Swiss-Prot record:
Name of the gene this protein is made from: KCNK1
Name of the protein this chain belongs to: Potassium channel subfamily K member 1
Intramembrane segments: 104-116, 117-122, 212-224, 225-231
Region (Disordered): 315-336
Record-linked InterPro entries: 2pore_dom_K_chnl, 2pore_dom_K_chnl_TASK, 2pore_dom_K_chnl_TWIK, 2pore_dom_K_chnl_TWIK1, K_chnl_dom
Record GO terms (molecular function): identical protein binding; inward rectifier potassium channel activity; ligand-gated channel activity; outward rectifier potassium channel activity; potassium channel activity; potassium ion leak channel activity; protein heterodimerization activity; sodium channel activity
Localization per record: Cell membrane; Recycling endosome; Synaptic cell membrane; Cytoplasmic vesicle
Site positions per UniProt: Important for increased permeability to Na(+) when K(+) levels are subphysiological: T118
Cytoplasmic side: 1-20, 157-181, 268-336
Function in brief: Ion channel that contributes to passive transmembrane potassium transport and to the regulation of the resting membrane potential in brain astrocytes, but also in kidney and in other tissues. Forms dimeric channels through which potassium ions pass in accordance with their electrochemical gradient. The channel is selective for K(+) ions at physiological potassium concentrations and at neutral pH, but becomes permeable to Na(+) at subphysiological K(+) levels and upon acidification of the extracellular medium.
Region (Selectivity filter 2): 225-230
Length: 336
């Protein structure tokens, strides 16, 4: 008997705090996923980093031995200055000195990466005035960009997602949930083809040092707003029509970001995903509780009004009776 009562009480406790339990498992799963990613990246990339470090040490030692007139300290200073300039997007190589980082097309590309929070990091402001303006520009521009993207995605979703699903549901009588799932999958495949596979093939042709995997990697890193900056298009030597190429990349990134958000919004509107998300949310107050609160307020208000009316009646009863002129006129002829 006690075991059954304890079991039922535990079940009721779990059901009552189901959202909190689900949220706790969500946090734990996210932390485990972070640790899993760290373990995989470390095990895969650490050997390559070690090989690169050994290769650089050998190359540096060989260079110092071949150039005895140059001390190791002077070489360190030179390399430090070169790496510092490279962090600002300025390369010391002769074949890269012709590309300017702050012409109009490059500045437009930089502004788009700042507002979309992609931030490749290959080009950064050099002056203090540029850094200050970048802060002010981002503070105003990022919320403006979010507002712009929200409005565009809402309008596109109506025409691309909601109306087609409603048309097939009303016109052909298909189940709305089934139509929504099929539509979301097809829209995702079309978006991946148009904004990942096709652009990756184009970049692998236009960029001399990129293969298809590296081009696809750039497309994904850019449209997901990760923006690592290890691959940036239009930075090659003697890039043809570089300004037009940069403007085209800016348009591609903006349209691709909108397409990604439309696909995410389409999947988020699926009934199954809505039910799944609600498992981790804090439950809202039930309508019955709100009705009880309103009824309680009404009862308290009515009790106050009744008390006020009772006080007025008592006050009238305690006052002395005074005949009004109308009552006197009314009683006069009768008595006469």
């Amino acid at each position: 008997m006690l075991q059954s009562l304890a079991g039922s009480s535990c079940v009721r406790l779990v059901e009552r705090h189901r959202s909190a339990w689900c949220f706790g498992f969500l946090v734990l799963g996210y932390l485990l996923y972070l640790v899993f990613g760290a373990v995989v990246f470390s095990s895969v990339e650490l050997p390559y980093e070690d090989l690169l470090r050994q290769e650089l040490r050998k190359l540096k030692r060989r260079f110092v031995e071949e150039h005895e007139c140059l001390s190791e300290q002077q070489l360190e200073q030179f390399l430090g200055r070169v790496l510092e300039a490279n962090n600002y997007g300025v390369s010391v190589r002769s074949n890269a000195s012709g590309n300017w980082n702050w012409d109009f097309a490059s500045a437009l590309f930089f502004a788009s990466t700042v507002l979309s929070t992609t931030g490749y990091g290959h080009t950064v402001p050099l002056s203090d005035g540029g850094k200050a303006f970048c802060i002010i520009y981002s503070v105003i521009g990022i919320p403006f960009t979010l507002l712009f993207l929200t409005a565009v995605v809402q309008r596109v979703t109506v025409h691309v997602t909601r109306r087609p699903v409603l048309y097939f549901h009303v016109r052909w009588g298909f189940s709305k949930q089934v139509v929504a799932i099929v539509h979301a999958v097809l829209l995702g495949l079309i978006t991946v083809s148009c904004f990942f596979f096709i652009p990756a093939a184009v970049f692998s042709v236009l960029e001399d040092d990129w293969n298809f995997l590296e081009s696809f990697y750039f497309c994904f890193i850019s449209l997901s707003t990760i923006g690592l900056g290890d691959y940036v298009p239009g930075e090659g030597y003697n890039q043809k029509f570089r300004e037009l190429y940069k403007i085209g990349i800016t348009c591609y990134l903006l349209l691709g970001l909108i397409a990604m958000l439309v696909v995410l919004e389409t999947f988020c509107e699926l009934h199954e995903l809505k039910k799944f998300r609600k498992m981790f949310y804090v439950k809202k107050d039930k309508d019955e509780d709100q009705v009880h609160i309103i009824e309680h307020d009404q009862l308290s208000f009515s009790s106050i009004t009744e008390q006020a009316a009772g006080m007025k009646e008592d006050q009238k009863q305690n006052e002395p009776f005074v005949a009004t002129p109308s009552s006197a006129c009314a009683d006069g002829p009768a008595n006469h």
